[in-house]
Amino acid sequence: HLDYAHLNWSEVRELCGSPLVEIGNHTYDLHEFKGKDGRKGANIKKGEAFADYKKVLTDDVTKLQEKMNEHLYQSSRVFAYPYGFYSDESEKILKGLGFDITLTCDEGVNLITKDKECLYGLKRYNRPYRAETEAFFKNIGIE
């Protein structure tokens, strides 16, 4: 988010050199929350035709994939939904674009199996800035 955190391409490229870091796609420009009937992040709008939505999401995500190829010499296999808003439609489109993993903002623990489908719609916990590791995990029930 431009108001509180960002990296430049050089910094991201440096991170790509680590086997511990995976750089993901978070859309190029679908980070708005436009009220009750508007678009919420990368999600389909109420009443929007699937074909129209598919074009919007595909064009946007592809633009960032192309930028990643240009600056990082690789694209992403991972997609994190802005604001965590997702739908069956978005999952279908992203699978079609070659993403292997999607991350929501739903809180919870994931059960990872040998079935690749379990990597779509993954839950996660948002760790607040400055939260102590031990206290954070204790708070979510992991000790």
Where in the sequence are the language-model features?
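Active-site glycine- and acidic-residue-rich loops that bind
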Residues: 1-9
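C-terminal active-site subregion of NodB/CE4 polysaccharide deacetylases
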Residues: 14-18, 22, 28-143
